[in-house]
Every structure is written in C-alpha cells, then in structure tokens.
A protein has these predicted regions:
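Short linear motifs centered on Gly/Pro in flexible linkers and helix caps
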Residues: 5, 16-19, 36-37
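Bacterial N-terminal signal peptides that target proteins for export
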Residues: 12-27
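Bacterial N-terminal signal peptides
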Residues: 25-36
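Pepsin/retropepsin-fold aspartyl endopeptidases
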Residues: 2-11, 38-342
Length: 342
C-alpha cells in the first residue's frame, strides 16, 4: 500500500508500508477486559472540532527517578504490530503486543501454561473485543515487568492465540505521567517518566484526550470531524457506520468485503474502501484504506452516533518514530528522514 502525506507546509511526502496486509482477515486486538466480570462503559467526551485542545489542566505527579525506566529492542510482528519483551512473575521474556487500544493486559493459553499458574474460573473476566464479548478465565500475576518498569500485580485474562504469533497483549492504560517512545526505524522501545518536553523539530503533534484509559484524538476525515482511537494493537484502521454515512458522497461505490476477527474469535464483516483525505494534526494523509462496519465494540462504547475511526498500525507504523506523552496529552510523529526531505 502506498500513502501520500502532506505536511502543514504542503510539502509532498510519500512512503510505503513494509508489511503484508491480509485482505481476508484483519485481526483487531483493541479490547476491553474487566476483572471479575464487571464491565464499565468508556466515558465519551462530546464531539469537538478537529483542533488542538487549549487550557487542559494536567495533574502534577511526583516522579522519584527522572531516568528512563526501560529501553530495549522491539520488533514488529508479521502483520505490523509492535511487540515488547515482558517478564511475568520473573519468567520470560514473553512477546506481548504493545496495545494502546487495550485497557487491560492479557496472555494466551500457551503463555499461561508456561507460567505454571493455574487459571481461575472463580474470578472470570469479561473481555470485549471489536467483534464480540466473552467470559474467560484469569491467572494472577504478582509482577509484570518491562525492564525496570513495573505494571503488576494484575489478574490477566487468558485468551486464545489471536495475536499473530505474540504471546499476549500489553496494555498501557495505567500510564499517567509516562512517555512511550517507539522508534520503528531502529527497533527501539522506551517507556520513561515524562519530562513534559515539547516535540522536537520535524515532529508533527496530535493533541490527545483520555477516555477509559485509551488515547483519543479529534481528526478530520474528508472534512468530517471524527473521533479517533489510537490503537497500536490493530492491524487495520476501522470506521463506524456513522463515519461512512457522513462520507457517503466521497466514498466509492465499489467496495470489498473484509472479515474482522476479534480477541473473542468472533468474526464480523465490513466494507473495505479507500478513504478520503485524513487530517491528523498538521498532516494530511492520502491513500488510506479503511474498513467500515457496525462493529460490536462501537456499540458497546456507545460510539455509533458520532463518526469514529480506530487508527491502526497500517497508518501509525508508517512513521519513523511515534511518541505518546501521557503527561502532555499528545502524540508526536516523525516522518522518515528520506521522505521528509523531499
């Protein structure tokens, strides 16, 4: 797939994706997992115009250690998502998909077995994915560590192997004052206390707000104000029917059917079609393909009335560097140098 990106100064940027995109099944890992079968709706802010937020008050959190907590090599799996090496109860490292679109970490059945921890059916978790909901057993993890960065303890839902070869999913929803730095060009992942640094030269800035622990942005799709979920756990970008209806005059009549398989192994179909221009911060993206459908997750979160787009790695992985600064409430994106210089 080839994308064209226009910067704010209208300089043309072009680059290509470096991984295979299946036209038969786009496996989306964005999920909501709540331990002990207690499901909460994500509070959805009122629709806004696609412009930077002003006057946002951020809670100051004391950080004892200003040094980076974790720096390690990272890899993208065969469908383009990021996986990180994680120790669970001191064992591993296990390859977990780094998923900004998940509000709870989870592991596969094989990972649970290798940990030697018996699953609990007395305290099941309800897992809600893009395509459905299911009750699953859990295991208790006393510690979840990425380098020196600790995310545990936690009860982890145990899921079937739908992670494209990875051994689970790593949620970052508990981060409040941290900065996630993913350098795709050099296979580097860093999670560190945020120093509230402004974006460096050459980075585009996308303001974020948090809803249920998920990073969301206000963007424009074909000129239509759209709520965007930043989802590094999804292979493809998926839009709801409200967005498709708003774009009815701009989308082609010819579409192809694509199957979406969620973490519960239930499948739903959507229409895959070229998207109109997407304005993300000061960048304008041409040539995106989006799957539109009445997905279960949009219904669960009451995101059916307002145009909504879950942005996956088909777009996010096309940048050289992606930074999500939870303290500054913003995403910073760096274009590939050879493209930005054109």
């Amino acid at each position: 797939m080839s994308l064209l990106i226009l910067r704010g100064d209208m300089t043309l940027i072009q680059f290509r994706h470096g991984w295979h995109r299946s036209h038969r099944a786009a496996c989306c890992l964005l999920l909501l997992a709540v331990a002990r079968a207690c499901a909460d709706e994500i509070p959805v802010p009122a629709a806004q115009q696609a412009q930077p937020e002003r006057g946002v008050e951020l809670t100051e959190i004391s950080v004892q250690a200003p040094e980076p907590k974790f720096v390690a090599p990272t890899r993208r799996d065969r469908i383009g998502r990021i996986w990180a090496p994680v120790l669970i109860d001191g064992k591993g490292p296990y390859r977990l998909v780094l998923d900004t679109g998940a509000n709870h970490s989870a592991v596969t059945e094989h990972t649970a077995q290798s940990l030697g921890t018996s699953t609990s059916t007395d305290a099941p978790a309800r897992v809600t994915g893009f395509t459905g909901s299911a009750m699953v057993p859990t295991i208790h993890a006393s510690s979840i560590d990425i380098g020196a960065f600790a995310l545990g303890p936690a009860d982890l839902p145990v899921l079937s192997d739908v992670f494209g070869g990875a051994e689970g999913v790593l949620s970052l929803s508990d981060l409040k004052n941290e900065r996630v730095f993913a350098d795709f060009a050099h296979d580097r992942l860093e999670i560190a206390p945020s120093q509230r640094e402004r974006a460096a030269k050459g980075f585009a800035v996308v303001p974020l707000h948090m809803a249920g622990g998920l990073p969301m942005a206000e963007i424009l799709v074909g000129g239509v104000p759209t709520r965007a979920i930043i989802d590094t756990g999804a292979q493809s970008s998926v839009g709801n029917l409200a967005l498709r209806k708003a774009l009815a005059r701009q989308t082609p009549r010819k579409t192809s059917r694509e199957e979406i398989i969620g973490v519960t192994l239930e499948a739903q179909s959507g229409d895959s079609m070229p998207s109109p221009d997407i304005q993300l911060g000061h960048l304008t993206i041409h040539g995106m393909t989006v799957v539109f459908g009445d997905m279960y997750l949009f219904q669960h979160w009451n995101l059916t009335r307002e145009p909504t787009l879950a942005i996956g790695m088909d777009l996010l992985g096309s940048f050289d560097v992606m930074i999500i600064d939870y303290a500054r409430r913003e995403m910073q994106l760096q274009l590939r140098p050879r493209e930005a210089s054109r």
